[in-house]
Amino acid sequence: MRTTIKLFLPIIIALSITSTSTAQPSGSFISEEAQESCVKYGEEYGICPEMLMAMIEKESSGRPDVESGGCKGLMQISDRWHKDRMERLGVTDIYSVDGNIHVGADYLSELFEKYCDVGIVLMVYHGEKNAATKTELSDYADWILTRSAELERMNGK
């Protein structure tokens, strides 16, 4: 029995060190750089940083190089639709972690001013048809809100 414990103990220790070294303090698996930008722009725009993190997890799985349907980067920003916003904010590289989150947070802020309701804001951001008139949350909005709440709990909020 003691021999078995001696054999498995180093493996268990190695696994626990590996799993803790890759975990982010926020509970999110996105990069530390992205988390810092979420906090920075969350504070600047009055948006919950954990919601930004949840959106990044959902939109791009935390990968800054992702492109889908013309939308690019962590928050899946369309440089076609947000060209003026990018210029106004001084963002020249939509794949830049900080720049992408800056554009996404600025757009969300605009949507919050227009719609006020977080569910509608998320559905409009996601490009859902008739989002402003829906009476129920979409699966996308529900997932973001649920994950955001989980991240907030992990951060002691």
Labelled PLM ranges:
Residues M1-L9:
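Bacterial N-terminal signal peptides that target proteins for export
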Residues T18-S21:
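N-terminal signal peptide c-region/cleavage motif recognized by signal peptidases
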Residues Q24-K157:
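Catalytic glycan-binding domains that act on GlcNAc-containing polysaccharides
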Residues F8-S16:
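Bacterial N-terminal signal peptides
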